[in-house]
């Protein structure tokens, strides 16, 4: 046997030269590593035991070598137990320790594998020489715009939306700046791919399509170690976390750990639409199990804990540790967005932490803000004020009650009447019928403010006929509940009924755009949570709006960041809802749109950010002082640009 006893292991630098003694890697423990010597045919000749002392000695000190003659001269077969390379990658050494070497400066092959710095064929001739890329790429140099054109061509070749989603996610993990430039410049086409509705299918099949982690997974097994796990994430200056426990993914129910697709998708939009730096975004899934029997028993590719979902004290303790750890690790100004938690946890978490953390629930608050913005816009077509309307909701969960509360709050501010009084203009229907005072004792706490004096009404259609609403809002998560009779009844009560079918994904929408326009004889003012194609009715083309939270949360988050806000206030949500409505033109109204097109979303986000930041300064909740004079310009200047950087 050959025994090597050396002071330290000298490594080569990324430029190919040897490191100095001060640059050399110190090994903290003495551990034998079995490797081999290779002959001229690259076959292993002898076993070599290398022991490296932790003590640092002279780099030029002699090395004692002892050859164990008991080892036969014949080379071992690679499959039978030899070691083919420095990583020891063969079946005989699967249980051996190896060191995953890495370098601090991306160069050469590693640079092409670094999504944050990779430019693909866009590396210039000078960059290829400076960073050891010569020969690792074809000789042609392609500009950024041509790369975008090529990628869009390739993505359009896929006919299946999930395949397009996978192509986009692969690109994000290969070339980050190309991904965001592609998404920004083709947002209307790609938004339904990277987010709803396609992301819903991606979450359902997440275990099957999972290749590389794009965020942090924290499970019950990690209790007591969450702070340690946060430090494993490579980026340290985190400004936004989107976190889910996977219990209520869109309208698809409990998908457990596979809900990770939602935080990943949301944060891609934070960057593309709101300009928040990708390195400042962290997707997190809290895995406390799942009650989805199909995932537990039938899906062999499920990536989460195969156990029933934790609840009660066990759940609360894990979430409390998480909330404490992220604040300790990232600071007071960290924005934590709760995403797709079930009703019973969503309201409790928001209520518990809104006074101690910078928290935001997109399902409750983001949806409310975007819908309020759509209503402000729609009233320009209908006429009258918000207080003149009567609202009826199908669905009394997070989205429904969140929207209802923000509407009531805005009415209260506009009319100077108490909030309790303004709530009386809003009615909700749940699975048991109209929410009325006689049901008060059996209602969940978040439904109780909406229990008005009225006789019980069990059927949704009967509630419409009784309440006679001017605005119908669906947040039930159940598809095709706005039937032909429902839409026709709304149309008989109103010249221009406002109908919002908000449930996601498309399969869960209360009705389609075509149904709404056809059944209302083209009179409905319609918007939906998922996108629908334009509809032609009686020779007129109707373009339905999408009440997508993506109008609000990216700009909202940017506003909190640029102001250094320490808490979220309801007045910020009201301020944010005004910006989309201000961007709707008469040309948009003529097509039936109550939301502006997504092509101008970064402009909208900058205006939302400015309004949110201004409100933060007004309320004394901003920590980034002094306040900039022009907040819109400041917001735009803070936005991430996907333009390639030039490397030395």
UniProtKB/Swiss-Prot annotation:
Q: Which residues bind a divalent metal cation?
A: 339-340, 363
Chain sites annotated for binding NADP(+): 392-408
Q: In which pathway does it act?
A: Photosynthesis; C4 acid pathway
Q: Where is the transit peptide?
A: 1-61
| Enzyme Commission (EC) number | 1.1.1.40
Subcellular location, record wording: Plastid, Chloroplast
Q: Where is the active site?
A: 195 (proton donor), 266 (proton acceptor)
Keyword terms = Chloroplast, Metal-binding, NAD, NADP, Oxidoreductase, Plastid, Transit peptide
State the PANTHER family in the record: MALIC ENZYME-RELATED (PTHR23406), NADP-DEPENDENT MALIC ENZYME 4, CHLOROPLASTIC (PTHR23406:SF76)
Family, as annotated: Belongs to the malic enzymes family.
The protein in question is named NADP-dependent malic enzyme, chloroplastic
Q: Which gene encodes it?
A: MOD1
